[in-house]
Swiss-Prot record:
Family (UniProt): Belongs to the UPF0301 (AlgH) family.
Source organism phylogeny: Bacteria, Pseudomonadati, Pseudomonadota, Gammaproteobacteria, Alteromonadales
UniProt-recorded name of the protein: UPF0301 protein Sfri_2850
UniProt-listed PANTHER family: UNCHARACTERIZED PROTEIN YQGE, UPF0301 PROTEIN YQGE
NCBIfam families with a match to the protein in the record: PRK00228.1-1
Signal peptide limits: none
Gene Ontology, cellular component aspect: cytosol
């Protein structure tokens, strides 16, 4: 299977795992060893501004815009770890380029910049991540658990989390509710 890096996984309507039900996961890494991604449509009920205060990263005097974005549950693995998906900027301590439109940073310095003129233009903050071991994701796709689409910055950064699953399914080009949950091979 080709790499699904910079793709969205869209949970099938028949997925009965309450944690991943109606989830959209942005795949940050996918290779022969496994996959890592962030769920991008499940708010935890905390605003980014409140998270920064809890971390004692108070808004700087250069604060230039309002923070009304929500912190998301990235997945069940390492829920104490924070991740920021953002538009490209190269000056963070621990950043990885995922695509020409998206980077992943897991260092505290990016959080300290949020809300200032040094902040990335667009960002998503998540706690925890979703991970798959070797061949696990491929098997879940074969089992009809996930559908995939190429990620777009518009969907990642400009759609409210609560609307993302519906918007992502509309990108598929067919009515997802018409799909069978049965898997088979002719």
């Amino acid at each position: 299977m080709d790499s699904l890096k910079d793709h969205f996984l869209i949970a099938m309507p028949s997925l009965d795992d309450t944690f991943f039900e109606r989830s959209v996961i942005y795949i940050c890494e996918h290779d022969q060893k496994g996959a890592m991604g962030l769920m991008v449509n499940r708010p935890i009920g905390v605003e980014v501004e409140d998270l920064l205060e809890q971390m004692e990263l108070y808004l700087s005097p250069e604060f230039v815009f309002s923070l009304d974005s929500q912190v998301l549950i990235g997945g069940p693995v390492a829920p104490e770890r924070g991740f920021v998906l953002h538009t490209p900027q190269q000056h963070w301590v621990n950043s990885t380029e995922i695509s020409e439109d998206t980077m992943l940073t897991s260092s505290r310095d990016i959080l300290a910049s949020i809300g200032s003129d040094k902040s990335p233009e667009n960002f998503v903050v998540a706690l925890g991540y979703s991970g798959w071991s070797k061949d696990q994701l491929e098997q879940e796709i074969a089992d009809n658990t996930w559908l995939t689409i190429k990620a777009t910055p518009e969907l990642l950064f400009n759609v409210e989390p609560e609307q993302m699953w519906l918007m992502a399914t509309q990108q598929l080009g067919f009515d997802i509710w018409q799909m069978s949950s049965q898997v088979g091979h002719a």
